A protein has these predicted regions:
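Aromatic side chains
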Residues: 7, 16, 27, 69-72
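Alpha-helical protein-protein interaction elements
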Residues: 8, 19-22, 52, 64, ...
């Protein structure tokens, strides 16, 4: 699962060919013992994150929405995608 971004101890990854599980563009978030799937639109789809970290992820996703959709479109076609700038 390639890493898209890392900031504030939050790791964001996207899986190739992963449109069957949730049927919407999403990415996977890892923070300490927490794991979650978050839609490109910022919706928490599965799992859990502390509120502060979820808000940081949602802010990052809003800033990079176009890049996330581009990465998703590549990922579902098994085409490599690049990293996205972290939240600063």
């Amino acid at each position: 699962m390639p890493e898209l971004c890392r900031f504030y101890n939050i790791v964001i990854k996207m899986i190739y060919s992963d449109n069957d599980q949730h049927h919407k563009p999403h990415f996977h978030v890892y923070y300490a013992e927490y794991e979650a799937s978050v839609g490109v639109d910022g919706e928490l789809i599965a799992g859990s994150l502390p509120v502060k970290q979820l808000k940081l992820v949602q802010a990052w996703a809003a800033i990079h929405e176009d890049e996330l959709y581009a990465a998703w479109n590549n990922a579902v076609r098994n085409i490599p995608f690049g990293k996205i700038e972290p939240l600063r």
